[in-house]
């Protein structure tokens, strides 16, 4: 009985160590902030065009089309 209890506790300890080393911890600074584009005009149809406007003219990391009420708007994104 002692041998099996010892074996079980060693096995559980190894399992916890494996779980602790493989668990991914996401850093807190990976948040994406978004704001409505000032330069994009009209309804946003192409996410690619939105991203180009946000990157080249507004100095953001990227952009995408998103529903803002009843219309699709260009939303610029960057890391917070």
Swiss-Prot record:
GO cellular component, one term: extracellular region
InterPro entries given in the database record: Defensin_plant (IPR008176), Scorpion_toxin-like (IPR003614), Scorpion_toxin-like_sf (IPR036574)
Cystine pairings recorded for this chain: 33-80, 44-65, 50-74, 54-76
Localization per record: Secreted
Domain of life: Eukaryota
GO annotation, biological process: defense response to fungus; killing of cells of another organism
Signal sequence interval, chain numbering: 1-23
Keywords from the named record: Antimicrobial, Disulfide bond, Fungicide, Plant defense, Secreted, Signal
UniProt xrefs under PANTHER family: DEFENSIN-LIKE PROTEIN 1, DRO1 PROTEIN-RELATED
Family: Belongs to the DEFL family.
Protein's name in the database: Defensin-like protein 8
Species name: Arabidopsis thaliana (Mouse-ear cress)
Originating gene: LCR73
């Amino acid at each position: 009985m002692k041998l099996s209890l010892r074996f079980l506790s060693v096995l559980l300890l190894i399992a916890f160590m494996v779980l602790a080393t493989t668990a991914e911890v996401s850093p807190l600074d990976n948040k994406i902030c978004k704001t409505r584009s000032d330069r994009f005009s009209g309804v946003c149809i192409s996410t690619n065009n939105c991203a180009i406007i946000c990157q080249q003219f507004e100095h953001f990391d990227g952009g995408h089309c998103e529903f803002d009420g009843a219309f699709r708007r260009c939303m610029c994104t960057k890391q917070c």
